[in-house]
């Protein structure tokens, strides 16, 4: 009986610790080079009120692929990356827009609703290969332009930032 009580107490203690960590919104620390920093209205962080990610921590969120044409490449191209809605859910983003900044200081503002409505991704790979900085990488916001006619216009092309380095949720 004492052994059973002790085991139940251990299970309760472990459950409490795990639940407390989930409520705290503490994300795992990246071990590699940080590629992306999220800030602003986010609940889950790992770096002084921000959420930082390396390649491995982004890939752990789950990757998807789609083929589409775009103004930047000839023919259909396969992009592989993290669904942006999944990334926003993971960090507990709340707000109406995301201010995206690229390595070259290009900025664009994207409605948060785009990510769910259009299944936009944060691409890490093009045609199965990691994107290099000189090839619009390492991170590129891509919409499945061929899936809906409304995505084939300058509004969505301008939201498709490449060399993405940070996102501020407002």
Residue ranges and their predicted role:
Residues 3, 25-170:
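N-terminal intrinsically disordered, low-complexity segments enriched in P/E/S/T
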């Amino acid at each position: 009986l004492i052994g059973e009580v002790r085991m139940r107490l251990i299970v309760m203690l472990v459950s409490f610790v795990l639940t407390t960590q989930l409520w705290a919104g503490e994300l795992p620390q990246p071990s590699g080079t940080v590629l992306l920093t999220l800030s602003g209205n986010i609940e889950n962080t790992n770096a002084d009120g921000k959420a930082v990610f390396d390649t491995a921590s982004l890939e752990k969120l789950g990757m998807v692929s789609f083929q589409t044409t775009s103004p930047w490449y000839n023919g259909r191209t396969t992009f592989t990356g993290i669904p942006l809605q999944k990334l926003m859910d993971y960090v507990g983003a709340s707000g109406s827009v995301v201010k995206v900044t690229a390595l070259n200081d290009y900025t664009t503002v994207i409605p948060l609703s785009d990510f769910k409505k259009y299944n936009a991704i944060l691409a890490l790979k093009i045609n199965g290969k990691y994107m290099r900085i000189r090839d619009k990488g390492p991170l590129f916001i891509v919409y499945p332009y061929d899936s809906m006619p409304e995505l084939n216009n300058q509004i969505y092309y301008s939201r498709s930032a490449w060399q993405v380095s940070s996102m501020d949720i407002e």
